[in-house]
């Protein structure tokens, strides 16, 4: 079994799901060009484009709201919140 960090496991898992299912997309702060604060989405925007790897404003409640709404319509969003503490503002969604 390969030994890897969480980030090393998450990145290829997201890529594999995005290749397998066109309904999967990623949204969050700096997930596109910068590849996320920890690099979890590095290279995904180059591979899948800006429509499937979306940089969002600094608004966790908006990220959660968009993800919830997209899921209600059959899409498969991956909402990236930079830090666990930042999820609390999203709970009102």
Task: State where each predicted segment sits.
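Thiamine diphosphate
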Residues: 1-93
